[in-house]
């Protein structure tokens, strides 16, 4: 009796895998957003969603980048819309690529500072200033959890 073995070169498997990823990215809706990691003293600002499928989950404030808009300009606009305040965009932190069930998210994250201390929640149901030790105390949206872990590990 012969033992038949099929040998498939690793590079061929990788090519098939890469093609499947490209196909999925083509099919899935692509969303590009920005997020503000607003720092004050030893804390960062987190907001709780008050709407949609991810209602009650926590995130860093921000939103979609409009066509022709730089990430920094989008961040200033989104914070003005969501929190009625002005920020300075200080330092790039990271870009997170995350596949949600219905879309692929690319999120550019920046450390930011408040230029005006007054904040008003226009879209969120709650907000908290969290120390790095408190970052695990809220239920983050999956992509934002990646960011929270990133900044916690960079201390």
Regions found by a protein language model. Name each.
Residues 25-44, 64:
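Conserved N-terminal beta-strand and adjoining loop/helix that marks the start
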Residues 40-81:
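Conserved Nudix-box catalytic region and its N-terminal flanking loop in Nudix hydrolases
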Residues 111, 120-151:
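NUDIX/MutT-family hydrolases
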């Amino acid at each position: 009796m012969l033992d038949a073995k099929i040998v498939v070169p690793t590079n061929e498997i990788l090519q098939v895998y890469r093609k499947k990823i490209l196909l999925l990215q083509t099919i899935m809706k692509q969303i590009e957003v920005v997020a503000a990691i607003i720092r004050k003293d030893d804390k960062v600002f987190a907001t709780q969603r008050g709407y949609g499928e991810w209602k009650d989950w926590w995130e860093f404030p921000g939103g979609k980048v409009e066509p022709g808009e730089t990430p920094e300009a989008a961040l200033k606009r989104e914070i003005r819309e969501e929190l009625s305040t002005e920020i300075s965009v200080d330092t790039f932190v990271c870009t997170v690529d995350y596949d949600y069930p219905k879309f692929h998210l690319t999120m550019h994250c920046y450390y930011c500072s408040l230029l005006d201390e007054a904040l008003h929640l226009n879209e969120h149901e709650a907000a908290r200033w969290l120390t790095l030790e408190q970052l695990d105390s809220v239920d983050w949206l999956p992509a934002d959890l990646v960011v929270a872990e990133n900044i916690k590990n960079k201390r």
